[in-house]
Amino acid sequence: MLNINGGKLFMKKILVTLIARVLSTGVSFGADHKANIIVVTHGSDTDAFWGVVRNGVEAAKADTGADVQYRNPPTGDLNEMASLIEAAIAQKPDGIVVSIPAPDILGGPIKAAVAAGIPVISMNSGAGVSKSLGAVMHVGQPEYEAGLGGGEKSKGLGGKNSVCFNHEPMNTALKDRCQGFADGMGEKLNMVEVSSDFDDIKNTVIAHMSSNPDTGAIMAVGPTGCDPTIAALKEMGKAGKVVLGCFDLGPAIVDGIIDGTVNYAIDQQQFLQGYVPVVVLHLNHRNGTLPGNSINSGPGFVTKGNVELVKKLAGKER
């Protein structure tokens, strides 16, 4: 079993403590040191996951006093996101934060930002290509390893004949999650692409389960896919009878863990993905410092044994 819990969670607590200490040293962040930072993500307006990321961005803005703007394509359109990055470059900010779900579409604008002398930090997706595109660091979780840990856990719980539902098939990070999950299960990848619509996903899950009644393990790569999967399993009377793992947290996933429908969630702590890059770019603008390495915000397992610890923060800071 891949151990992705204790040590890394402890390191994340240390990271937050160190940042808090830097921000509370008593040194004033005056006007001369005020950084202009633009955050551009691919998260759609309807995806609750990105609301938590934005909460992290806003918290960092408040803590540092930096001028921070958050931008995203309302529907998650990646070509529109590329245009948003290009528009950000034209403003000549002191730093840009980006997610990189599709390097083939977003790589050009990111390289252009770097060529213009703008420090870029990638977050959430793009860990594998971040350095090659010129980003100074990445804040996120190693997606394949996270999926691998999930697959090993599902297999250990007796799951077999697995399926991975992917609501963002263009996102390489989510493909990595599914591949890791399959490898952890010791099975061939069975990835089913779905839309981001709740009812469509629910109906797809029901149809798949009806056509493949021997399915014993499901992975949903985010709340967008997990929430309707929970509803589908309950409607079919299969809640608690199929091993269900989900990436990320939200109210429905937390409730699902408590009632036994969801066996575990893989938490990447997206609040940190919004918070840390802003703080790092602000401090880089102020005194020229950068961390020596990228920062893993996750992964870690949330199960019935520890869910109460994170319940109050789900959908807000986790």
Please provide the spans of the model-predicted regions.
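Short, solvent-exposed amphipathic alpha-helices that sit
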Residues: 48-64, 146-150, 172-189, 204, ...
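Flexible loop/hinge segments that line or gate small-molecule binding clefts
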Residues: 103-145, 159, 248-263, 309-313
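Hydrophobic alpha-helical segments within soluble ligand-binding/sensing domains
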Residues: 81, 137-162, 201-202, 249-253, ...
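Hydrophobic alpha-helical
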Residues: 86, 94-114, 181, 190, ...
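Extracytoplasmic "Venus flytrap"
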Residues: 36-64, 69-85, 91, 99-103, ...
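Short beta-strand elements in bilobed, periplasmic/extracellular small-molecule ligand-binding domains
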Residues: 62-75, 161-164, 181-199
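Bacterial N-terminal signal peptides
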Residues: 17-26
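Hinge/cleft segment of the Venus flytrap/periplasmic-binding protein
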Residues: 33, 184-188, 272-318
